[in-house]
């Protein structure tokens, strides 16, 4: 089941700015281990789903995964070969606006080695640099550029 909003007030949105760090969602709230964004970027619903599948396949049937981001912003695209003007394009997909320091995914109920590898596999599906964090080391954490 794809991650899309059930209904929206406006089909087309402005692009917006991604200045600064995240205001909320900076700390692990549910699991023991998390994946923190080191850059700001749009992350599509397909990228989120690919990361989720990569994590759950590696963990087999152990543990629990929490997705802390949701793609609630629509983006538009005009057809190939269409000239400039004539209005905004049709909605093409959904993205989550992710700012740096935001926790993207959380894992609980597995060992640290399993969680570290599962989140590393998930990070390869995302277009940003990420970092593995634990509940005990909220401030620091080991860097996992990839």
From Swiss-Prot:
UniProt superkingdom: Bacteria
GO terms for biological process, alphabetical: translation
Keywords: Ribonucleoprotein, Ribosomal protein, RNA-binding, rRNA-binding, tRNA-binding
InterPro entries associated with the record: Ribosomal_uL16, Ribosomal_uL16_bact-type, Ribosomal_uL16_CS, Ribosomal_uL16_dom, Ribosomal_uL16_sf
Function text: Binds 23S rRNA and is also seen to make contacts with the A and possibly P site tRNAs.
Assembly mode: Part of the 50S ribosomal subunit.
Recorded family membership: Belongs to the universal ribosomal protein uL16 family.
Protein name, per record: Large ribosomal subunit protein uL16
Lineage: Bacteria, Bacillati, Bacillota, Bacilli, Lactobacillales
